[in-house]
Amino acid sequence: IRDASTSRGLGDVYKRQGCDEVILYKSENFVEKVKYFTNGEGVDVVYDGVGKDTAILGLDCLKPLGTMVVFGNSSGNCPPIDPGLLASKGSLFFTRPTLMTYGTKEKDLLHSSGRVFEMLATNKIKLEINTSYNLSDVSKAHADLESRKTFGSIVMKNDY
């Protein structure tokens, strides 16, 4: 299951990448949709890159003993999570991983990046480059990224 915040057009992109279902979280009740798609069970893991707007609701998508992974905050910082809330929703786990923690040892970083490159090489991860900018337009690239005008991978081309 994948949620897309801006348009049905992104749903086509996500389906090409292997998603079975796409939910527009800003216009659909994504908790109800997740429960529907999972026959009321919920999911094992929620990966949330949005943060403030979706993190608490994401907890309601989880099965008991599920894991909430907040890795971004495009809508703002995630609100504080009360451990009692996690207990009441099924002994849930909550984490906010960062590359600075997981990539501190060279061997771990090489292992993790090697796994990603292997999945890219075997098409288990489908890379879509949807936007490219000249390096001289880096400020426009940042502005477009921050305003959510981009999706997928962005390539910066050296025009110097």
Region annotations inferred by a language model:
Residues 1-14:
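Single conserved hydrophobic/aromatic residue that forms the stacking wall/gate
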Residues 11-160:
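Terminal helix/beta-alpha structural elements that buttress the NAD(P)+-binding lobe
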